[in-house]
């Protein structure tokens, strides 16, 4: 390995208006090494990726290959240099085939005109065989029929086939099952063995410790640590990310819950089978289970998104009309869905518009939106939740994942619900934003609001919930109360009957 093999950033700075996104950052990306890039949302990770991709250039500083400065006028220049970024949401064309997506831009043609399908299929079969994907997809299969893990693999295969020498993975496991994530880790390790430089970005610190050779920490646009991964702990990484101790992520006491609030009896949908549950005021009820257990479907049935086949729902003893999200809102139920980008937010509207969405009765005058009234409601909520944005007119699509989630929560706080259902509320957000959301859950429960917390993160359920219901196959298989809420017990009841051991499903 020589200096000429390295990609590096040398004194990179980038400013957007008053925000210093990167401040004199220098990093070397070595062949055959997995470099984990961590930091809170807004630390500068995305800006660094945009510079490496050629989407935007640095204000000062240099991108180098070996000792040679390289300038990217557009993403194509970055690709030619051998740099590829595998985004959290894979960039594939759903109405094109697997083969066309893998070889996009370099499709073999007959006489320079007609697509040479025979040659394309042969080339694609070789690529699929190299990655052991022959059973997962076919060359002529439309990519719109593939799942998230398969679409991600297409991006990886495209990057390697095109000669990718530095490959960045941006939150690659955010939408993968445990088995799919393990498969991805194997691919990353194989790439490392072949001498590829890897940048791995993730908020899941356990993944970082497991995969990385070196960990680089960004905070407020500055590089604050660049150290070997050996010996690192989640606690030390988190402290470097946020600049303070966060040992007490879960500070919740077991609050004295009040009278019964929600009563669900015999609820049945296409994916939920005869579920009954109760939630009291001030109680945090956790819902645990593996992917496909029916947790999200249960939440959507309660709030009227999914069609109710049988069963009843009542708030404060008053029946809630079936299949009506509006009826659920009127009854005092708020819902923050797992897929906030597609199911909760108007991405190209402002923070103000999104946060005021559920209180039209308080933000309108004579049938028209009243900005002054909306500002009076939303401004204190944005301040309370520390939403990081220049102002409330900022487009939600420009916010980090943590701040987008805060906007969703602010919307429901404006509505002042009696019950709030949170489906994977901390998925894809950094450790600092997680701590803020945990504190908010504490405060809401202490104020008497009932919380249903659906989470795949065991520490959240163990640290926040008063009771945990475990689901498998659309049914509730166990109810656990403190002090009997622990990971082993949850996993035992979450396993389908066919599972031989927890290792078959959970890493």
From Swiss-Prot:
The EC designation for this entry is: 7.5.2.7
Enumerate the spans annotated as ABC transporter domain. 7-245, 249-498
Keywords attached to this entry: ATP-binding, Cell inner membrane, Cell membrane, Membrane, Nucleotide-binding, Repeat, Sugar transport, Translocase, Transport
Membrane topology recorded in Swiss-Prot or TrEMBL: Peripheral membrane protein
Binding-site residues, ATP: 39-46
Q: Which PROSITE patterns match?
A: ABC_TRANSPORTER_1 (PS00211), ABC_TRANSPORTER_2 (PS50893), RBSA (PS51254)
Please list the GO terms describing molecular function: ABC-type D-ribose transporter activity; ATP binding; ATP hydrolysis activity
Report if keyword ATP-binding is assigned: yes
Domain of life, source organism: Bacteria
Whether Transmembrane helix counts among this entry's keywords is no
InterPro entries xrefs? AAA+_ATPase, ABC_carbohydrate_import_ATPase, ABC_transporter-like_ATP-bd, ABC_transporter-like_CS, P-loop_NTPase
Q: Where in the cell is it found?
A: Cell inner membrane
Q: Which GO terms describe its cellular component?
A: plasma membrane
Q: Which reaction does it catalyse?
A: D-ribose(out) + ATP + H2O = D-ribose(in) + ADP + phosphate + H(+)
Describe the protein's quaternary organization and the partners it interacts with: The complex is composed of an ATP-binding protein (RbsA), two transmembrane proteins (RbsC) and a solute-binding protein (RbsB).
Q: Give the family, as the similarity comment puts it.
A: Belongs to the ABC transporter superfamily. Ribose importer (TC 3.A.1.2.1) family.
Q: What does this protein do?
A: Part of the ABC transporter complex RbsABC involved in ribose import. Responsible for energy coupling to the transport system.
Q: What is this protein called?
A: Ribose import ATP-binding protein RbsA 2
* Species this chain originates from: Mesorhizobium japonicum (strain LMG 29417 / CECT 9101 / MAFF 303099)
List the gene name: rbsA2
